[in-house]
């Protein structure tokens, strides 16, 4: 379905981003992988995996909080992969603390990584997508882009911001063949979430399985993790012709979290 298209997926060396990149490559899209601090061995393994899928693949270590590094990654995608047809803004970090104890530098880092980076990247690719008459901007938001949780002020602010930014991008691209949508996952067993599970294990002195169940029970009625593969499947749908008139939307994939 996506043969001949090229996708940049930020934060795609693991977790949700890798799941999305695999799903897009499975439909024939060339992939620009991105990670920060990945080892040469990890990069080589990823390139081998994607090349075996029959698509072109490149890797760029851009720090998504640095506009000049994102610009260099976009230039590399044009030079090595033929352009940018799909942009998936996925890179994110988390920090948990009450507002009155939240370190300012941590706030700045979360906003820069989770929100500002999407603006930096989108502004670099939007004009070319409009000129081409086809493009997909997919922002990985969160259930926390729609509802809040205590202790996550920066993350919630950033993810609410991503949903709003998605809508503005959709309005400014309406009628051009470019769409902009957000995916709002609930709990996904990524390295980011595993850290929160580890914290519960340490605090409560319970097993990993018990901590996982406790985490899920607090928010996610299905009591099952969303998988990166499921999120990748939704991203593929949003790139399809069937989704050509879906824009400015925020799709929950959260086991019923925000239905409560």
Give residue spans per PLM region.
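Short, small/polar-rich loop/turn modules that mediate ligand/substrate recognition or access, typified
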Residues: 174, 179, 246-248
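C-terminal substrate-recognition "lid" of short-chain dehydrogenase/reductases
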Residues: 81, 119-120, 126, 130, ...
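Residue(s) in the substrate-gating loop at a strand-loop-helix junction
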Residues: 142
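Conserved glycine-rich Rossmann-like NAD(P)H-binding loop of the short-chain dehydrogenase/reductase
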Residues: 27-44
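Active-site helix of classical SDR
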Residues: 122, 158, 166
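Substrate-binding pocket helix/loop in short-chain dehydrogenase/reductase
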Residues: 98-99, 103-111, 216
